[in-house]
């Protein structure tokens, strides 16, 4: 809790990120964020036709296998030391809990966007296989 006097980098254990951490850290400090969440654009295709209905239940349209784009959390964060004081002792407490508590405290949270090609979540089987292929090519 009181062991850090500078912002720290926190990362999930199942991600690989190919991005300049110094740039992310500088962005965090320059913007004076209490938390910076590194985010990436990710496309998700629904493997079915998606039905859209009106408020009376009538079918308006069917969109076949649409692709949606979301800004997703990569699992890499920069934390200002003062947010660490919000973490309760001896209690299971997720990073999303901390983010919500920081928001409730009206502290500043920002997002640093990176390319979808810049990170892999090896906790996902398909991405793990892709990471293995890439790492074996070196």
Feature annotation, model-predicted:
Residues 53-54:
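Extended acidic/charged loop-beta regions that coordinate divalent cations
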């Amino acid at each position: 809790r009181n062991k850090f006097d500078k912002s720290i980098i926190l990362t999930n254990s199942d991600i690989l990120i190919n991005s300049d951490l110094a740039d992310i850290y500088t962005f965090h400090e320059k913007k004076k964020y209490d938390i910076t969440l590194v985010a990436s654009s990710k496309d998700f295709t629904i493997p079915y036709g998606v039905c859209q209905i009106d408020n009376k239940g009538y079918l308006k349209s069917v969109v076949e296998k649409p692709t949606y784009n979301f800004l997703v959390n990569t699992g890499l964060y920069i934390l200002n030391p003062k947010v660490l004081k919000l973490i309760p002792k001896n209690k299971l407490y997720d990073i999303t809990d901390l983010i919500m508590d920081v928001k409730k405290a009206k502290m500043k949270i920002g997002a640093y966007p990176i390319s979808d090609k810049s990170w892999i979540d090896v906790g996902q089987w398909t991405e793990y296989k892709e990471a293995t292929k890439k790492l074996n090519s070196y």
